[in-house]
From Swiss-Prot:
The gene is MT-ND4. InterPro entries: NADH4_N, NADH_Q_OxRdtase_chainM/4, NADH_UbQ_OxRdtase, ND/Mrp_TM. Core subunit of respiratory chain NADH dehydrogenase (Complex I) which is composed of 45 different subunits. The chain crosses the membrane at residues 22-42, 60-80, 94-112, 113-133, 147-167, 194-214, 224-244, 257-277, 284-303, 308-330, 342-362, 391-411. Core subunit of the mitochondrial membrane respiratory chain NADH dehydrogenase (Complex I) which catalyzes electron transfer from NADH through the respiratory chain, using ubiquinone as an electron acceptor. Essential for the catalytic activity and assembly of complex I. This is NADH-ubiquinone oxidoreductase chain 4. GO terms for molecular function: NADH dehydrogenase (ubiquinone) activity; ubiquinone binding.
Length: 459
């Protein structure tokens, strides 16, 4: 535990005391070393948890998400270099400090043993994210996006605090490792149903559930590249992780209360996928595709089967890497043509063939081409939902079809077609960008060879 937390905190002096010309290389190499040190977390020989102290532990559910969090920091630093090129050094260092603070909070959130501690850290991740969006976003609408982000997530989270205090008083402890030992079955009553709603709503907003998703496209579109990456790859997964932990405690109630949410997810999944087909803004399209993928994860968790938990974990990791890669590609387009409109970037394949290859790989992963882990996750979710109701297979099949359509639409619109007249003297693709894309795609390829390390505690 400490051999991850202490080097992460040591990134602060590395950032502030580094020579200005060496700041990027120092922080990137240091954070990459931390992510490689964290690989030991993925090894769970007996499927038990690693208990680091009374307050922190890791198990097969949190370990892949921890690894994803640590892997993302060097990638965010690499992706942000162009965005911060004209900023003064103090602001560059402040930006990096925000990213490091966010990483520290996220690592501690995924490792928290007590649910109250988990809640405090879960809320603490809002502050650096909000500062990143509202201070370093590209347009003035970033303030509006920050307000949406803050109020949606805070309003959803307040009932969770009340519910956790109530559970603490009735059970005596909220320690995740021992809670199953004295867990009493909750009575079937209105108060229990309200308790379930209060507990689950914070995570539904964070995921986000269709209907509570309005903050997500705004936050994604207005955030700088690192904000978009961490939001899509890790912060949405906090919702899924929390939902898995909390539904285990509220066990029998979930089975009766989940019906309206399952229907809303299955409906919203198709709606948001259809919205993607109508998008002209590249970042907005990727944001709506995140809502669609997360709806699948909510379905898998609420059905409450071991296969569902496996599918949800696999899909969360796969989506984290894929959507982060798509945001990086959208950002590299934006850096060259200074517009997020897809039609403005058409025909780029002739000028930047290697970038077009990355676009192809990212789009194919997004539409869950075999044998990617995206497909493994989607198949497990499909099997789970089919065991719950046969009709869901039609809806999920339709969603897969629309996902394939908008992924290919995005690829063809941005890469194929006739080159626009003002796109002739573009910068070539940089080694930094190619390294960034390969560091997204390599974990996806390696996980295809051995997916069991990310299939969670029920494998």
């Amino acid at each position: 535990m400490l051999k991850i937390i202490i080097p992460t905190i040591m990134l602060f002096p590395v950032t502030w005391y580094s020579n200005n010309s060496m700041i990027w290389i120092n922080t990137t190499s240091h954070s990459l070393m931390i992510s490689l040190m964290g690989l030991f977390l993925l090894n769970h020989p007996s499927n038990n948890s690693n208990n680091f102290s009374l307050n922190f532990f890791s198990d097969p559910l949190s370990s892949p998400l921890l690894m994803l969090t640590m892997w993302l920091l060097p990638l965010m630093i690499m992706a942000s270099q162009y965005h911060l090129a004209k900023e003064p050094w103090f602001r560059k260092k402040s930006y990096l400090s925000m990213l490091i603070t966010l990483q520290t909070f996220l690592i501690m959130t995924f490792m928290a043993t007590e649910l109250i501690l988990f809640y405090i850290l879960f809320e603490a991740t809002l502050i650096p994210t909000l500062i990143i969006i509202t201070r370093w976003g590209n347009q003035t609408e970033r303030l509006n996006a920050g307000m949406y982000f803050l109020f949606y997530t805070l309003t959803g989270s307040l009932p969770l605090l009340v519910a956790l205090i109530y559970l603490q008083n009735s059970m005596g402890s909220l320690n995740l490792l021992t809670i199953n030992l004295w867990l009493k079955e909750l009575p079937n009553s209105w108060s229990t149903n309200l308790l379930w709603m209060a507990c689950i709503m914070a995570f539904m907003v964070k995921m986000p559930l269709y209907g509570l998703h309005l903050w997500l496209p705004k936050a994604h579109v207005e955030a700088p590249i690192a904000g978009s990456m961490v939001l899509a790859a890790v912060l949405l997964k906090l919702g899924g992780y929390g939902m898995m932990r909390i539904t285990m405690i509220l066990d029998p109630t979930t089975k009766s209360m989940a019906y309206p949410f399952l229907m809303l997810c299955l409906w919203g999944m198709i709606m948001t996928s259809s919205i993607c087909l109508r998008q002209t803004d590249l970042k907005s399209l990727i944001a709506y595709s995140s809502v669609s993928h997360m709806a699948l994860v909510i379905v898998a968790i609420l059905v409450q089967t071991p296969l569902g938990f496996m599918g949800a974990t696999a899909l969360m990791i796969a989506h984290g890497l894929t959507s982060s890669m798509l945001f990086c590609l959208a950002n590299s387009n934006y850096e060259r043509i200074h517009s997020r409109t897809m039609l403005m970037a058409r025909g780029l394949q002739t000028l930047l063939p290697l970038t077009a290859t990355w676009w192809l790989l990212a789009s194919l992963n997004n539409l869950a081409l075999p044998p990617s882990i995206n497909l493994i996750g989607e198949l497990l979710v499909t099997i789970t939902s089919f065991s719950w109701s046969n009709i869901t297979v039609i809806l999920i099949g339709l969603n897969m079809l629309i996902t394939a359509l908008y992924s290919l639409y995005m690829l063809i619109t941005t890469q194929r077609g006739k080159l626009t007249y003002y796109l002739h003297n573009l910068n070539p693709s940089l080694t930094r960008e190619n390294t960034l894309m390969s560091m997204h795609i390599l974990p996806l390829l390696f996980l295809t060879l051995n997916p069991k390390i990310i299939l969670g505690p029920t494998f």
